[in-house]
Structures are given as C-alpha cells and as structure tokens.
Amino acid sequence: MNFGTSGSVQINAGESISYVDGLISSVLFADKTERHYLLEGTINACNSLFYKLEKDLGIPHKQMNWHHRCQETETDGIYVPSTFGIAAPYWVDHIKTISEGYGNNLPNEILRAGMESIGFLVNDIWALTKKHLKVLPQHIVASGGGSRPPLLQFISDLTGMTIYHSAMKDRTALGVHLLLTKAHTGQWSNVQSDYEDSYSPRMKKKMKDKKINKWHSALKKAGVT
C-alpha cells in the first residue's frame, strides 16, 4: 500500500490472469519466461483530503498535524468525501458528501472520520480481493507520506492483518531498481527492506462490525452504492 496525495493498494495476483470487477488488472512484470499480474485498488484522496479539510475547517496549516489529532481522537461519526469522487472499488464521481454523527470534539472528530474513510476504502478493496485470490499475503507493507500510525492501526483493525510501515521512504524507486536489475542480469536483486513499525489488530469485533455497517449505510446515503 502507498499513501501520498492519493492512495493505492496493490496485490500480486500471481501468474494467472485475474479480473475483479471494481479493481484494476494489469501486468506486474513480464519477460520471455514468465509473467505476473497485478490487482490494484486506487483511492482518490489521502493527503489531499486533509488539505481540503484543513481549508474547510479553517485550521492553520502549522496547527493541522492530522495524525496527532486522529491519534488522540475517537468518533462515532462518518465522513464520505465527495469532492474527489470515490475510486476503487465503486468508481463513482457525482455523490453527496456525508459528514454526520459527531460528538463535541470538533473539528478533530471530523478529521478522524476523514481518516477512517481512507481505511474503510482499503478494507472494501481488501474484502473484494480476498474473494478472488487463492493465495493471500500474510501481512501488508505501507509506505508514503500519508502512512501515519493512526491510519495504519485503523486499517489493521478493519482488515485483521498486521501492517508494516516501511523504513524506505520511496519504494517506487526500489521497484524500478529491481526491474532494471532483472532486465540486465536475468536475476532478481536480493534487497532487504526494513520496517520501522508494525500494527496488529486490537479493535473488538463488535466495534469493528458496527463501524463497517455505518460506513456502508453512509455509502448508500451518499449515492455510492
């Protein structure tokens, strides 16, 4: 997974072509002897969502620190962003913004709900993927400037997977290096990627199910599903 201005969840689908309605299918790697396929779910707004909320809520940029605010905040509220539309796995653009159900800790609860909307979309992508792949990853690696602790913990809680935060800031560059090495030598480079932190599920199932049900109800209200 990578979270920057936008976000992406990429899954190695193996050597068999895999088509999943709602996800992007493409070739991950190919040469004369082998071909591997990729399933990808894209998220239109990650950091860009917080830039928008910063402006909408009148929060000075230096005081934003959304990850600190979200780390210290819980909410029963739900936020479905409409400005950027919803990409995977729904692919809709003209929808209604849903922002409701907050307590008294504003604007932090809105920021938390905005962050959770990213996690919900990751979980929806992951839930769809699980139905179609025979071999699933044992853990998930996250990179990018938006891969902050509260978001990664929330994704772990929803998916039930351990999330590792990559110590390597630019994993795109690593991918280019690996492909070029393979093209020139015929062998994959043995590159070890270290992890800074890991996040394991800790949310109770009752709470998780309640949150996911609220999210899907909000998607219907917004005209997404």
Regions found by a protein language model. Name each.
Residues M1-V141, S147-T225:
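Active-site core segments that coordinate phosphate-bearing ligands/cofactors
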